[in-house]
Amino acid sequence: MKFNLIDIEDWNRKPYFEHYLNAVRCTYSMTANIEITGLLREIKLKGLKLYPTLIYIITTVVNRHKEFRTCFDQKGKLGYWDSMNPSYTVFHKDNETFSSIWTEYDENFPRFYYNYLEDIRNYSDVLNFMPKTGEPANTINVSSIPWVNFTGFNLNIYNDATYLIPIFTLGKYFQQDNKILLPMSVQVHHAVCDGYHISRFFNEAQELASNYETWLGEK
């Protein structure tokens, strides 16, 4: 997958990037509820799983916008990937640990769903942190905390503040006013992502969840 270098001197985000990366290092998170009433009903009718469906929605929106694909490469150069693949957590009930498994993204949901099922079949019972080798650099991290319908979630990453890729966390869905809602938290780096961008993410994720008939397809 191609990594496109960014010319910082000719980049409209240069002053914001330098300020929030160097002067005032700043990451932040936002949590919002996604309504999944119709989506949940439809995937149950089709015998599909909710988790990979939500992973697909997240990755689809990420791949629409460069700010969610911007990062430093292994040489420390700034740029953005053409597209991203999801790396997601799978819980092991027997020993209360989890694995992180990555799946190749496909904009066609049935094909992505098939890829997910194959990876789950091959790796979900392997009690390793990262049982599937060869994880590419162009991945986003998705995790699930399906035991709590939280109202806020924050990750504290202690490094040199150069991790620019967003991190997504899903909570337990619940019913409110005849609607099924699911909390979703997104952690971003302010150097590459502002409030407008993260708000657009939530709005587009909700749009996909509401208009599931346009992409869900046949099982």
Curated annotation (Swiss-Prot):
Gene Ontology MF term list: chloramphenicol O-acetyltransferase activity
Key words of the record: Acyltransferase, Antibiotic resistance, Transferase
Pfam families: CAT
Enzyme class name: transferase
GO biological process: response to antibiotic
Active site: H190 (proton acceptor)
InterPro entries reported for this sequence: CAT-like_dom_sf, Chloramphenicol_AcTrfase_AS, Cmp_AcTrfase
Assigned EC number: 2.3.1.28
Disulfide bonds: none
Catalyzed reaction equations: chloramphenicol + acetyl-CoA = chloramphenicol 3-acetate + CoA
Entry keyword Transferase: yes
The keyword DNA-binding belongs to this UniProt entry's keyword annotation: no
Domain of life: Bacteria
TM region(s), chain numbering: none
Xref: SUPFAM superfamilies: CoA-dependent acyltransferases
Family: Belongs to the chloramphenicol acetyltransferase family.
Protein purpose: This enzyme is an effector of chloramphenicol resistance in bacteria.
Quaternary state and interactors: Homotrimer.
Name the record gives this protein: Chloramphenicol acetyltransferase
Source organism per UniProt: Clostridium perfringens
Gene name, Swiss-Prot/TrEMBL: catQ
